[in-house]
From Swiss-Prot:
Family per similarity comment: Belongs to the papillomaviridae E7 protein family.
Subunit note: Homodimer. Homooligomer. Interacts with host RB1; this interaction induces dissociation of RB1-E2F1 complex thereby disrupting RB1 activity. Interacts with host EP300; this interaction represses EP300 transcriptional activity. Interacts with protein E2; this interaction inhibits E7 oncogenic activity. Interacts with host TMEM173/STING; this interaction impairs the ability of TMEM173/STING to sense cytosolic DNA and promote the production of type I interferon (IFN-alpha and IFN-beta).
Stretches annotated zinc finger (unnamed): 51-86
Record-level Gene Ontology MF annotations: DNA binding; DNA-binding transcription factor activity; protein domain specific binding; zinc ion binding
Keyword Mitochondrion set for record: no
Post-translational modification: Highly phosphorylated.
Transcription regulation as UniProt keyword: yes
Gene name of this polypeptide: E7
Protein name: Protein E7
SUPFAM superfamilies the UniProt entry points to: E7 C-terminal domain-like
Sequence motif LXCXE motif, location on chain: 25-29
Purpose of the protein: Plays a role in viral genome replication by driving entry of quiescent cells into the cell cycle. Stimulation of progression from G1 to S phase allows the virus to efficiently use the cellular DNA replicating machinery to achieve viral genome replication. E7 protein has both transforming and trans-activating activities. Induces the disassembly of the E2F1 transcription factor from RB1, with subsequent transcriptional activation of E2F1-regulated S-phase genes. Interferes with host histone deacetylation mediated by HDAC1 and HDAC2, leading to transcription activation.
């Protein structure tokens, strides 16, 4: 500071000296790319569904939360499971 009051260029210069240290702060470390999604854990489920003839069918699956919800939607909607006896009858029709 040259006078009794600081001028704008002098204040900016002093702030730059405080903000910009002389040490090299650039990081040259390379990071390996990680998968965007974390692995979701598989949980065992037992699915009990009925065939059209009334037989009970059991399925055992490993699924994520999203996967078991999708399976539930399919079984309640567009997909129907059949027992081995009904499958045999369907083959001969």
């Amino acid at each position: 500071m040259i006078g009794k009051e600081a001028t704008i260029p002098e204040v900016v210069l002093e702030l730059q000296e405080l903000v910009q240290p002389t040490a090299d702060l650039h990081c040259y470390e390379e990071l390996t790319e990680e998968p965007a999604e974390e692995e979701q854990c598989l949980t065992p489920y037992k699915i009990v569904a009925g065939c059209g003839c009334g037989a009970r069918l059991r399925l055992y699956v490993l699924a994520t939360n999203l996967g078991i919800r999708a399976q539930q939607e399919l079984l309640l909607g567009d997909i129907q499971l059949v027992c081995p006896e009904c499958r045999g009858r369907l083959r001969h029709e």
